[in-house]
């Protein structure tokens, strides 16, 4: 898909609305990880340099009502007091993000205390001003399932501009007012530089990758990755399956997995996927040895198991050295690598070795000329933890959105933009 971007429209003197993804982790009113803020800077800097009348930024930050309800329920269960107002102020207000963005852009970022009713405030600012509106999800209309309610809310937002730029890849799979309805009400609707880059790297991986291609799919559950696996079986030369989901596949082959995480309801699904792979000539790489533990905790004693079968009293926590050698063999000389999900409990240092070596092998393949794409929150956290993000061709900013693309799905927040 060739998208029109912010570089394809004239912005001088225009009112520009940008949907960004500033859904960042917050603690006590402080930004804990500014990766998504940093990712938006190239697009915003480019737009500012074009001399627009103003730039209005729209974002969400968590889901205030749902998050507060959950936290309040947990507090009641534990018999603890709960201050709903303080909770929302500490985790869902975008003012700290405006301050963070101002430092990165090197220009003032004005903050509007609401996302509606701000036209007079915005138009009273000097030309070229940048304004961040308050959390769009403070208004339930944003996520309403009622099309008329969403459109009415989107019309409120449409008053702020003539050109819509979507640079919020992380929400592109959501059919929300600010991502899908709003752009249809604007004179021009184009992609930001971040979305353009995401589509440029991710779409070929699932539609027409350079071969040989190796897909690495990990994480805890088969149930959350069925559509991804089915999609990748159509394009991959080899499929490496690791993490907790690997034990469901091993059990489907009659392998003993001890007390490892298994989704018994999906064993037949795992068998079906293995049969599809065999019919399609796709090599499936499952663990042949393991690093195990008797309990699931950070200080558990690692136990090496040099066999595909796991003893009854142990659970798999990471892959072993023979499995890593198989990874090395399959990744040597590849043209494309897609990685979604860790192959072990990398959050625990004692069980991080497999995921660390995998990341290193993918980095080496990239150095040798392969195109590598990393998508999914845990994989992104892993390459960042091991200091290897800069050696990947592309590290996606979208968890759910990248997963939907890997499934071969159309993203509504992108399909509504100009091509």
Curated annotation (Swiss-Prot):
EC identifiers of the protein: 2.7.2.3
Pathway in which this enzyme or protein is active: Carbohydrate degradation; glycolysis; pyruvate from D-glyceraldehyde 3-phosphate: step 2/5
Keywords on record: ATP-binding, Cytoplasm, Glycolysis, Kinase, Nucleotide-binding, Transferase
Subunit-level organization: Monomer.
Catalytic activity line of the entry: (2R)-3-phosphoglycerate + ATP = (2R)-3-phospho-glyceroyl phosphate + ADP
EC class (word): transferase
Superkingdom classification of source: Bacteria
Transmembrane segments: none
GO cellular component, one term: cytosol
Taxonomic lineage of the native organism: Bacteria, Pseudomonadati, Spirochaetota, Spirochaetia, Spirochaetales
Name of the protein this chain belongs to: Phosphoglycerate kinase
Pfam families on file: PGK
Residues binding substrate, per UniProt: 21-23, 36, 60-63, 137, 174
InterPro entries cross-referenced by the UniProt entry: Phosphoglycerate_kinase, Phosphoglycerate_kinase_CS, Phosphoglycerate_kinase_N, Phosphoglycerate_kinase_sf
Residues noted as binding ATP in the record, renumbered to the chain: 225, 316, 347, 376-379
GO terms of biological process kind: gluconeogenesis; glycolytic process
A Gene Ontology molecular function term of the record: ATP binding
Disulfide bonds: none
Location of the protein in the cell: Cytoplasm
Family named by the database record: Belongs to the phosphoglycerate kinase family.
């Amino acid at each position: 898909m060739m998208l029109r971007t912010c570089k394809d429209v004239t912005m001088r003197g225009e009112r520009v609305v940008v949907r960004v993804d500033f859904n960042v982790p917050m603690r006590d009113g402080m930004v804990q990880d500014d990766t998504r803020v940093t990712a938006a800077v190239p697009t915003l800097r480019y737009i500012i340099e074009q001399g627009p009348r103003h730039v209005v930024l729209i974002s969400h930050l968590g889901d205030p009502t749902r998050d507060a309800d959950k936290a309040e329920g947990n507090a009641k269960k534990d018999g603890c007091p709960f201050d709903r107002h303080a909770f929302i102020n500490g985790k869902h207000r975008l003012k700290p993000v405006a301050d963070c963005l101002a430092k990165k852009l090197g220009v003032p970022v004005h903050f509007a205390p609401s996302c509606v009713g701000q036209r007079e405030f915005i138009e009273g600012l000097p030309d070229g001003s940048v304004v961040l509106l308050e959390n769009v999800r403070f208004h339930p209309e944003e996520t309403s399932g009622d099309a008329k309610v969403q459109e009415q809310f989107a019309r409120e937002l449409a008053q702020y501009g003539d050109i819509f730029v979507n640079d919020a890849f992380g929400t592109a799979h959501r059919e929300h007012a600010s991502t899908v309805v709003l752009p249809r009400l604007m004179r021009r609707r184009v992609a930001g530089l971040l979305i353009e880059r995401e589509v440029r790297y991710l779409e070929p991986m699932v539609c027409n990758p350079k071969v040989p291609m190796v897909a690495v799919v990990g994480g805890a559950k088969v149930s959350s990755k069925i559509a991804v696996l089915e999609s990748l079986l159509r394009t991959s030369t080899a499929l490496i399956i690791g993490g907790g989901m690997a034990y469901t596949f091993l059990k489907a082959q009659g392998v003993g997995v001890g007390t490892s995480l298994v989704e018994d309801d999906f064993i037949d699904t795992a068998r079906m996927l293995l049969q599809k792979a065999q019919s399609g000539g796709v090599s499936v790489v499952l663990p042949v040895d393991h690093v195990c533990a008797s309990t699931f905790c950070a200080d558990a004693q690692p136990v090496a198991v040099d066999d595909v079968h796991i003893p009854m009293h142990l659970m798999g926590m990471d892959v072993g050295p023979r499995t890593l050698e198989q990874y090395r063999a399959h990744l040597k000389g590849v043209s494309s690598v897609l990685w979604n999900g860790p192959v072990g409990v990398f959050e625990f240092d004692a069980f991080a070795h497999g995921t660390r070596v995998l990341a290193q092998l993918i980095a080496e393949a990239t150095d040798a000329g392969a195109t590598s794409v990393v998508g999914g929150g845990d994989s992104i956290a892993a390459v960042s933890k091991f200091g290897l993000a800069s050696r990947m061709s592309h590290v996606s900013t979208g968890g759910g959105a990248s997963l939907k693309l890997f499934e071969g799905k159309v993203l509504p927040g992108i399909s509504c933009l100009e091509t």
